[in-house]
Regions:
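Residue-level signal for functionally critical sites in structured catalytic/ligand-binding pockets
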Residues: 1-2, 6, 16-18, 88, ...
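Active-site-adjacent substructure of cysteine-protease-like catalytic cores
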Residues: 47-107, 111-112
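Short amphipathic alpha-helical surface micro-motifs
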Residues: 26-27, 47-50, 74, 118-124
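Cysteine-nucleophile protease catalytic domains, especially the papain-like/related folds used
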Residues: 1-50, 55, 61, 131-156
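Noncatalytic regulatory segments and standalone regulatory/sensor domains
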Residues: 24, 83-84, 93-156
Length: 156
């Protein structure tokens, strides 16, 4: 949702979830994420085997990148490097010398991971039966920002 807002798309979350065919069991597939971006005319580049430095270059160019990684697992789950069942989408919006900063829909705050933590978690299965494994997948938004930081409206 944050990448849509960044690109100036004003659409209700329920409609986006319907377009993306999001379900409670498998979430939203990468294919359907890309469909939604295309539906709204957004220019994106998606690929696997990205690195933290690729994310830094995208941020430097003013381009947020959505990625899928492992997060918020329970105590009984395997180590993140071996876990493919706790996939979660986040958007890279910044960085420090040794960490990547995210907009995270599961947090009220921005979140971060060190480069090493990110590399250990940056994989997922793309839902459904016999899903493909994704490694280092990211989707970088090339559409320029249309977000108006100073725009406010009255809450009716």
């Amino acid at each position: 949702m944050s990448m849509l807002v960044f690109a100036g798309v004003e659409e209700r979350e329920q409609r986006i979830l319907k377009l993306a065919k999001t379900d409670k069991k498998d979430g939203t597939s990468v294919e359907n994420i890309l469909f939604v971006f295309g539906y709204f005319g957004m220019d994106v580049v998606a690929r696997e085997h990205m690195t933290p430095d690729d994310l830094r270059k995208a941020v430097d160019g003013g381009h947020p990148t959505m990625l899928t990684l492992q997060a918020y697992r329970d105590d009984k789950a395997p180590a993140y490097k071996d876990d493919f069942d706790d996939g979660h989408y986040v958007v890279c919006i910044g960085y420090t010398e040794d960490a990547i900063i995210f907009e995270d829909p599961a947090s009220f705050h921005r979140t971060f991971l060190s480069d090493g933590e990110l590399i250990e978690r940056w994989h997922d299965c793309d839902g459904g039966t016999n899903p493909p494994k994704l490694n280092g997948w990211g989707c970088t938004l090339l559409t320029p920002s249309a977000y108006k930081h100073d725009l406010t409206e009255h809450m009716d």
